[in-house]
Amino acid sequence: MTIQPFTMSAQTSGNRFEAGKGTFLLNGEPFVVKAAELHYPRIPRPYWDQRIKLCKALGMNTVCLYVFWNAHESQPGVFNFEGQNDLASFCELCKDNDMYVILRPGPYVCAEWEMGGLPWWLLKKKDIRLREDDPYFMERVAIFEEAVANQVKHLTIQNGGPIIMVQVENEYGSYGINKKYVSEVRDIVRKNFGEVTLFLCDWASNFTNNGLDDL
């Protein structure tokens, strides 16, 4: 078996990453994802580069990161992607360090973060059903995912960037069974991020409850 050598020094648009039969494929060659988990809002910005370099020194080739909705949209329609919240710059730093990125934009992320990343103001609508195919919730999810994509969709691997995969929701099987909701989130993510590889993350014991054929 040939393992794709890790380098992004010559990375250009037109690259591709996909799930093959029993292995991931980077430009058609088997690729082993060795991922570290780094959450940029939790790390002071002056230390971002150092933390990424430490992960690479440990033998990692990829950074997984959550996008915390309530960190970026503290009020409806008011977005902050600057300073500590500069998602694009963090992804660019990963690329500068020859690290790929797995993006996990929720909408729910858990991560021992307040409301799993969901904004508090969603609860002002008394009858809202969070993490369900509730019309208002899905409307706000669509707005948020579009805002995130506008920051980093140019950084997907197809566009010469480091983002190889984007996660849909997070461990939803531990919360409920609603394939309609999961499929709606998938469609929103697909619409905004294009042809990047999408995936679900769930416990094996309940993965099939919400699993979709293309995730």
Language-model features: where?
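Active-site neighborhood of glycoside hydrolase catalytic domains
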Residues: 136-214
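Active-site-adjacent "subsite" loops/lids of carbohydrate-active enzymes
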Residues: 109-150
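Hydrophobic faces of well-ordered beta-strands that scaffold small-molecule active sites
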Residues: 32-36, 61-65, 101-105, 164-168, ...
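Acidic-and-aromatic substrate-binding clefts and catalytic sites of carbohydrate-active enzymes
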Residues: 15, 40-46, 72-73, 77-82, ...
